[in-house]
Amino acid sequence: MNSMKQSLAICLSILLIWAMMPPGADAGAWPATTPTHAPQELYAPVPPNDMDALVAPIALYPDALVAQILGASTYPDQVEAADAFVKANLGMTGDRLQQAAQDEEWDPSVMALLQFPSVLEKLAQNLGWTSALGDVSANQQADVMAAIQRMRAKAYDAGNLKSGQQIKVVKESPDIIVIQPANPQVVYVPAYNPTVIYGSPVATPGYSTTAVATTAV
């Protein structure tokens, strides 16, 4: 099971790339993927409306960061441990922090989030939501990507998702909105309240919006 989960972040990254392919792109040029996580025997698929609410807190993050979050969400215990590690080593950042964590047996997606302490804290403080996000990421990958695009479209139509100094927003087709850092060397983590930024109220079960700023991304 661990070996299958270790490749989930890579698979999710490929799915994000696939979702961003423009209409008519040659599918043969992209690597074929197969499920990397066995569906839970008693798993009940999450319907679209509930899926939309589940991804709302991260749907407006840059694509590469979304992929890492989805992968890390399948390891909630590791996320909690990584958050505690960061808080215990507040004087460390960047490569130094990564070096200090080398002995930890964490998934690469969790290790990557060491560079984003605010994201780790959000995931650790909302473990119920994080676990639910991990379940759908492992069992309904394509549905998760579709939900992210639906929520981006809502924010875009509401005028709350646009290019700026931190991010570049490109609507490649009616169904595909790509979010990338304006500066490829700096990944900006937007702060927004998912209950209001999408134009209509969105309540995410198990997720607290306390101390989350409401901003146009």
Where are these regions (language model features)?
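N-terminal low-complexity segments enriched in Gly/Pro/Tyr/Ser
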Residues: 21-217
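Bacterial N-terminal signal peptides that target proteins for export
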Residues: 2-11
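Bacterial N-terminal signal peptides
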Residues: 10-19
